[in-house]
């Protein structure tokens, strides 16, 4: 029953929706300065007293006067390593608090220095090989740089012996991937869909066209069917220009130049050409690919003459 009564007394009576979240200037002006002036008589319902050297950071939320918050406030006294020194003992049983960054100056009305804020991070283990954690502490103290009094002095403790500490656990800061909406479509597909909708609204019917390549059996059938002029026109040989009847072919072999006349019947030619007049065209008839016996004999004679001359010459130069 006594523990429940103490728990009720520890909880401040705040209206729903209110949170204890003072600014840096408010912490120095309304909570730290009065505590330094009257350390025994001044007490705040939202801030308790704790010895940070005897508590681990994960145990501090249970010792706070305000539960259910993401940050916790405490009054603490500095434990100096040496009576006449400025260094503070920040070690606990499981680790130590290490200062990081530069101290921040706290001003009143943007021109009067009233306090300092130091940021510390808790490390597990012993320095300098401790493991960094996400526990962070902001230590607020008054702006007083006077040296500490000697141990035998009867003067009151210094102003910076007391501090307000704000403890919180920093999140890891891992960003979650942004999910892609299932209704999103690429820009090209969206544009094509808009074009189809526009054509449908205008009454235009789009019929897909499919081109088919002729199969091998169709090509063989066209070769066999010589009676169809259109089919033969697809397989017609290319047109070659025939040489004139008296076109000489001269071979220089030293002092005995020789020439012979080419036979126009040696070259393929078509009997008729395509007529493009009148906006149309006429498919030419298939040309004959058969060589007469007389032409074949002339070709053999010419080939024999060329072979005999090529064997006897040392350096032949062909002139057309």
Curated annotation (Swiss-Prot):
Residues 14-170 form the NAC domain. Keywords: DNA-binding, Endoplasmic reticulum, Nucleus, Transcription, Transcription regulation. GO terms for molecular function: DNA binding; protein homodimerization activity. Forms homodimers. Forms heterodimers with NAC26. The keyword Nucleus applies. It is found in: Nucleus; Endoplasmic reticulum. Pfam families: NAM. One of its GO terms (biological process) is positive regulation of DNA-templated transcription. Residues 114-176 bind DNA. Expressed in developing seeds. Expressed in developing endosperm. The NAC domain includes a DNA binding domain and a dimerization domain. Disruption phenotype: No visible phenotype under normal growth conditions. The double mutant nac20 and nac26 exhibit a floury grain phenotype due to decreased starch and storage protein content. This is NAC domain-containing protein 20. The gene is NAC20. InterPro entries: NAC-dom (IPR003441), NAC_dom_sf (IPR036093).
């Amino acid at each position: 029953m006594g523990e429940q009564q103490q728990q009720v007394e520890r909880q401040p009576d705040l209206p729903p929706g209110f949170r204890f979240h003072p600014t840096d200037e408010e912490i120095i002006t309304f909570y730290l300065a009065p505590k330094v002036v009257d350390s025994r008589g001044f007490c705040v319902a939202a801030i308790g007293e704790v010895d940070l050297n005897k508590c681990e950071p994960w145990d501090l939320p249970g010792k706070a006067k305000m539960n259910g918050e993401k940050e916790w406030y405490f009054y603490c006294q500095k434990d100096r390593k040496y009576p006449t020194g400025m260094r503070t003992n920040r070690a606990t049983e499981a680790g130590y608090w290490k200062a990081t960054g530069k101290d921040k100056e706290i001003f009143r009305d943007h021109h009067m220095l009233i306090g300092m804020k130091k940021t510390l991070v808790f490390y597990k283990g012993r320095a300098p090989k401790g493991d960094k954690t996400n526990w962070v502490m902001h230590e607020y103290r008054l702006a007083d740089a006077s040296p500490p009094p000697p141990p035998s002095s009867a003067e009151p403790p210094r102003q910076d012996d007391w501090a307000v500490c704000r403890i919180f656990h920093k999140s890891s800061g891992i960003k979650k991937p942004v999910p892609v909406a299932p209704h999103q479509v690429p820009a090209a597909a969206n544009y094509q869909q808009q074009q189809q909708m526009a054509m449908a609204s205008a009454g235009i019917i789009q019929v897909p066209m499919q081109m088919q390549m002729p199969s091998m059996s169709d090509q063989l059938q066209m070769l066999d069917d010589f009676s169809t002029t259109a089919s033969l026109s697809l397989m017609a040989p290319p047109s070659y220009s025939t040489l004139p009847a008296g076109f000489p072919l001269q071979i220089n072999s030293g002092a005995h130049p020789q020439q012979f006349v080419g036979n126009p019947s040696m070259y393929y030619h078509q009997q008729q050409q395509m007529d493009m007049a009148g906006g149309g065209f006429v498919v030419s008839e298939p040309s004959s690919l058969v060589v007469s016996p007389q032409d074949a004999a002339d070709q053999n004679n010419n080939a024999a003459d060329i072979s005999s001359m090529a064997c006897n010459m040392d350096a032949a130069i062909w002139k057309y």
